[in-house]
Amino acid sequence: MAVQQNKKSRSARDMRRSHDALEASTLSVEKTTGEVHLRHHVSPEGVYRGRKVIDKGADE
């Protein structure tokens, strides 16, 4: 088991933890349908950047 040789200072600990914060994912609104979706992902209706890329009716 690894054991540190010297005690980490509060500053070093906090600087390491500065990248651990959770942030909300960035959402986009589809300009044609108004649907909200993740950036660079297809909307639930199968539309990406104004074009229909997935035909939802063919799967069902």
UniProtKB/Swiss-Prot annotation:
One of its GO terms (biological process) is translation. Residues 1-44 are annotated as: Disordered. Keywords: Ribonucleoprotein, Ribosomal protein. It comes from the Bacteria. The keyword Oxidoreductase does not apply. GO terms for cellular component: large ribosomal subunit. PANTHER family: 50S RIBOSOMAL PROTEIN L32 (PTHR35534), LARGE RIBOSOMAL SUBUNIT PROTEIN BL32 (PTHR35534:SF1). This is Large ribosomal subunit protein bL32. It comes from Pseudomonas fluorescens (strain SBW25). The gene is rpmF.
